[in-house]
């Protein structure tokens, strides 16, 4: 005889009125898109009404037109900034997550190394950005390094918190089962810490764009930060806002990629 609970679940699954995954996704983005469209419409209407000149605040149609007209130029510089963001973020993740585990596992390191890391984190990154230009020039590496430094600390702290949060009784159980250190790390410690790690990665994803743009402000021959400075020099407000739209698109896309990676690596937390 079929279990009533299974029958109920099957009925719910086959219910034609149950919302599909696409419908849920569409509903999730419908309201933000509607709010954004309403904001742009109000902006387009209010700026001419208030007689604000274009060199102060352009209407959305002006900078979207500029975004289309100069799409080749803006795309070229956007890809450069995106490359800096991705490389700096990945470097921070590759270094900070294992380091967080090592610091938590070796208590003397937590007492000796972590305070030094905190000290260097307190140094404003924008203050040392000119030094990177002097030391490493105007190429890609200074921007990637600055992005790395901004992403490193949030990911490290989140990783340490996640590795430290594992119940000691779970570790006793793994030892009693004869699991090796590598098996415990791969099958127990990392999955248990992933929630914390991704919290840090999401914060770092926001800081990554800031690091790349600040690095380009200080010294660069390409990138959205360079275009922003060029637009500011000539009071080219449509170009400035077009660059901001492109930068926002990169940030949103990168944030969604991190969310997608979280869903891929943590399917048990996927919302139904």
Locate predicted features.
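Generic hydrophobic transmembrane alpha-helix motif, especially the helices
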Residues: 117-154, 161-162
């Amino acid at each position: 005889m079929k279990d009533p609970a299974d029958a109920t679940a099957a009925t719910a699954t086959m219910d034609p009125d149950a919302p599909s995954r696409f419908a849920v996704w569409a509903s999730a983005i419908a309201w933000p898109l509607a709010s954004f469209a309403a904001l742009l419409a109000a902006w387009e209407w209010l700026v001419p009404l208030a007689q604000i000149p274009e060199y102060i605040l352009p209407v959305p149609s002006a900078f979207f037109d500029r975004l289309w007209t100069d799409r080749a130029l803006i795309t070229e510089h956007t890809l450069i900034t995106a490359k800096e963001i991705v490389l700096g973020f990945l470097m921070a993740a590759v270094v900070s997550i294992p380091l967080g585990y090592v610091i938590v596992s070796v208590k003397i390191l937590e007492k000796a190394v972590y305070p030094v890391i905190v000290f260097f984190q307190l140094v404003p990154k924008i203050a040392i950005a000119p030094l990177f230009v002097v030391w490493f020039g105007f190429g890609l590496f200074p921007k990637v390094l600055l992005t790395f430094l901004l992403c490193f600390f949030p990911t490290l702290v989140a990783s340490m918190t996640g590795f430290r949060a594992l119940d000691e009784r779970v570790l006793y159980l793994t030892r009693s089962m004869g699991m090796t250190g590598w098996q415990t790390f791969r099958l127990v410690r990392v999955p248990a810490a992933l929630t914390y790690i991704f919290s840090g990665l999401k914060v770092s994803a926001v800081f990554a764009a800031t690091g790349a743009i600040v690095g380009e402000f200080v010294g660069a021959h390409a990138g959205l930060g360079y275009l922003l400075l060029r637009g500011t020099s000539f009071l080219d407000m449509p170009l400035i806002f077009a660059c901001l739209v492109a930068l926002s698109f990169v940030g949103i896309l990168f944030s969604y990629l991190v969310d997608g990676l979280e869903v891929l690596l943590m399917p048990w937390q996927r919302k139904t």
